[in-house]
Curated annotation (Swiss-Prot):
Gene that this sequence comes from: bpt
HAMAP family from the UniProt entry: Bpt (MF_00689)
MF terms (GO), sorted A to Z: arginyl-tRNA--protein transferase activity; leucyl-tRNA--protein transferase activity
Keywords: Acyltransferase, Cytoplasm, Transferase
Organism of derivation: Azorhizobium caulinodans (strain ATCC 43989 / DSM 5975 / JCM 20966 / LMG 6465 / NBRC 14845 / NCIMB 13405 / ORS 571)
Localization in the cell: Cytoplasm
Recorded family membership: Belongs to the R-transferase family. Bpt subfamily.
Keyword Membrane: no
Protein name: Aspartate/glutamate leucyltransferase
One cellular component (GO) term of this entry: cytoplasm
Function: Functions in the N-end rule pathway of protein degradation where it conjugates Leu from its aminoacyl-tRNA to the N-termini of proteins containing an N-terminal aspartate or glutamate.
Enzyme Commission (EC) number: 2.3.2.29
Length: 249
């Protein structure tokens, strides 16, 4: 292997497979491996170009005749929570999200199983074993953290950690210009808390505290109901063939 081939990422194209978002469509992906000392820098550049990370792979859609998957990132500095978002923040003000190393636990996996069974019982994640979950968390060569959400305790202001049961978890990459929410899951039995929305709102707050301009949400899929929630977080930027374009309403 030459010096050039080691330093230059190699990209590959998957075979067509059924689209998980739009019935009757097929998807293809272009992907590369995120390994070695330059994995973090490469992940930054690729995320800014519309890629997503899954374990040690960065990928983006490359579907023939379809451009429904659009990369979305929230503009942190200009974000103002709506009335419904403020209600969600109020409902969850007793929770705190603690950043931890990407180390899986049986408690996390139990919550993950409850979430997947409730929300994605027939999806590809339904069959994930505890070892599969551990790989999803640990197989990273970039700056990744787990954000664990628990109730605030008497020492939370000092140590930044909560106490008691685990309510939610977010697998998050720390990029040069923001936070990328790789995957999140939460207790599905307390819908009144709107925990999925709260996790995004809390990541916006965390990014602002860290001086980062963006929270990357992955793909908004035009025509997919389960991805439609991403449109609610405004202002945001969406990646087009002409670059990132701001959307305010």
């Amino acid at each position: 292997m030459t010096e050039h081939s080691r330093d230059t990422p190699q990209f590959y194209l998957t075979a067509p497979s059924p689209c998980p978002y739009l019935p009757g469509k097929e998807e293809r992906k272009v992907f590369t491996h995120l390994v070695g000392e330059r994995a973090g820098a490469l992940n930054d550049v690729l995320t800014q170009g519309g890629f997503r990370r899954s374990q040690s792979i960065a990928y983006r859609p490359a579907c023939e005749g379809c451009r429904a998957c659009i990369s979305v990132r929230i503009c942190v500095d200009d974000f103002v929570p709506s009335r419904s978002f403020r209600r969600t923040l109020k409902e969850n003000e007793d929770l705190i999200g603690a950043l931890r190393p990407p180390s899986p636990t049986s408690e996390q996996y139990g919550l993950f199983r409850s979430y997947v069974t409730s929300r994605h019982g027939s999806g590809g994640m339904a069959d994930m074993s505890v070892l599969d979950y551990a790989m999803m968390v640990e197989d990273t060569h970039v700056q990744t953290r787990l954000v664990e959400y628990r109730r605030r305790g008497p020492d939370s202001r000092i140590n930044g950690r909560g106490t008691g049961d685990l309510f939610a978890v977010a697998l998050t990459d720390i990029l040069g210009d923001g936070l990328s929410m790789v995957y999140s899951f939460y207790n599905p039995n307390i819908p009144e808390r709107s925990l999925g929305t709260f996790l995004i709102l809390d990541h916006i707050a965390k990014a602002k505290e860290m001086g980062m301009p963006y929270v990357y949400l992955g793909y908004w899929v035009n025509g997919s109901r389960k991805m439609d929630y991403k449109r609610r977080f405004l202002p945001q930027e969406r990646l087009s063939p002409h670059g990132w374009e701001r959307v305010d309403e």
